[in-house]
Amino acid sequence: MAFFFNRGRSRQPSDVVRSIKDLLLRLREPSTASKVEDELAKQLSQMKLMVQGTQELEASTDQVHALVQAMLHEDLLYELAVALHNLPFEARKDTQTIFSHILRFKPPHGNSPDPPVISYIVHNRPEIIIELCRGYEHSQSAMPCGTILREALKFDVIAAIILYDQSKEGEPAIRLTEVQPNVPQRGTGVFWRFFHWIDRGTFELSADAFTTFREILTRHKSLVTGYLATNFDYFFAQFNTFLVQSESYVTKRQSIKLLGEILLDRANYSVMMRYVESGENLKLCMKLLRDDRKMVQYEGFHVFKVFVANPDKSVAVQRILINNRDRLLRFLPKFLEDRTDDDQFTDEKSFLVRQIELLPKEPIEPSRSAREPSRSTANTTTVA
């Protein structure tokens, strides 16, 4: 099918790449920016056809391979990531399509299990991923950058770059050889900006940032479990403050639901046990049960039940539950009682009522084994 792209005035992939790079450099200059936008859009549209083909003709594998090599040689992916928010609307869409296709492109007879663009980013240009994250600083680039990031996040090495990078703008991004999983983060890296983007962004930006944030935290479980264990205090301080207590209903509800998913995932058992030891975390969850909005109450319930179902509650958690026993026993039977078709929810409420009834009169020090759980007990606190 290569003839489709070589007939007439069509140019070689390397020519298109160099032309786009030159136009991107001119786009930075206010005096020429408006003049190059149309030509840049045309060039990106042509590149999209090279990687995507048309309904009538498939893209040429050899031509896509040549295009990828030229883009890597000219560092065009980085330049596109930096400039994405300045591109015209259609050009942003085309850039998103180009990125998404080449991120998963594998040449015939390739030896690496990962696509070459992913390997290149990880070993040579992780700054591409960091700049795509920074696309959330601009409403124009938020959604295309988010779509590209979620395609890249299918690979755990990309998640590691986002989680562990602490570079400032203009500095080199982290390499995998520099990752120190046991060293707590300072809260200055790009990952921590997601809390701001989700909490303070426009509705569309916030929603897209949350989707990417959730992908980072739920897709590669072994990576994230270690990260949360090392950065537990700072992460959940940010999560509880900016997301669970967000003024946005959508952010609040989605964040509580995500919190429940994280805590009830077997891979995060140790993280869950640390979270439910905290009396302050329990107070926050009990506050959610009294929210004016039923879906916030419902999602809050699925976090609250983890505290109550834990057979080895901390003294702080026991004290709060014991002090509020009578009120909880009056409150829970009537809690969301209109959910008559949800048998599991009804059974869980009954279970929690029974657990609260069985609480001792005074807190009892939990066993040492509860504070140092083994993997064999990983599901003892989950309410079915």
UniProtKB/Swiss-Prot annotation:
GO CC terms, sorted: cell division site; cellular bud; cytoplasm; incipient cellular bud site; mating projection tip; new mitotic spindle pole body; non-growing cell tip; nucleus
Localisation: Cytoplasm
GO biological process, one term: hyphal growth
Main location (coarse class): cytoplasm
SUPFAM superfamilies: ARM repeat (SSF48371)
Keywords annotated in UniProt: Cytoplasm
Ranges where the record places region Disordered: 362-384
Entries under Gene3D superfamilies matching the protein: Leucine-rich Repeat Variant
GO molecular function terms attached to this record: protein serine/threonine kinase activator activity
Chain intervals with Basic and acidic residues compositional bias: 362-374
Family per similarity comment: Belongs to the Mo25 family.
Function per UniProt: Required for conidiophore development.
Name assigned to this protein: Conidiophore development protein hymA
Source organism: Emericella nidulans (strain FGSC A4 / ATCC 38163 / CBS 112.46 / NRRL 194 / M139) (Aspergillus nidulans)
Gene designation per UniProt: hymA
